[in-house]
Amino acid sequence: MRTLDPSFDPDAFFARARAATSRVLMLDYDGTLAPFHVNPAEAVPYDGVMPLLDEIQDAGHTRLVIVSGRWTKNLVPLLKLKRTPEIWGSHGWERLGPQGEYNVARISDVTLEILVTADEWIKQVERFGGRCERKPGGLAFHWRGLNNAQIAEIRSEVFERWIELGRGNDLSWYDFDGGIELRAAGRDKGDVVRTLVGEAGSGAIVAYLGDDLTDEHAFKALPPGSAAVLVRPQFRPTAAHLWIQPPAELLSFLTRWNEMAGCNR
């Protein structure tokens, strides 16, 4: 574990977690709880992670939330937890509650029409070897495992077609580890953090663990006293307070959270 922000003291943070009246632990999935895989359907969590999350949920001391760019219906089968936690999918466009209640934020008719148009690009991207992922409010183009020439072809193809739609087309361009996503403007993981922090109220201790550029919105939205944790094997510039390398340091962080949060019960 490496402290990135000189003003952040991990020991003091966990002491506050021990004394807090409520706690919220937000976790990204791909690249954070699970290593990346060429086939996303095979991106299973690191060994030991799911049993720890089961323990945290069973203890009842923490509101556990998965915050992912995936469509929730594609993520639930991979979790294999005893109880499905609260999940925010598609970068905040979807919310699946622990009791199964499901909501999707309203997407404008104009944006939906543009997404239908973008669907027409899929065959060309697949010819270059790419994979396309539809989700509420967006369309992701994946190139993990492809060579540089294929990646360049996909990026160029999507960029040219996106530009043809014109500025102000309501689809924002986002780079992520292993591809690009065109997503309806207006929501990101930072909005999820702000919503959950508001629901938790004053006195709550909050942590967010993520690996990708899309998690930076969440890191920056955290209130003072929270922990923004970058989880990835290689370091990159970030707004996070801590950098931990999975799986060993990820397991250590979750174990310490569970131990400290449970001390005051």
Predicted regions: what is each one?
Residues 33-43, 177-185:
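Glycine-rich phosphate-binding "P-loop"
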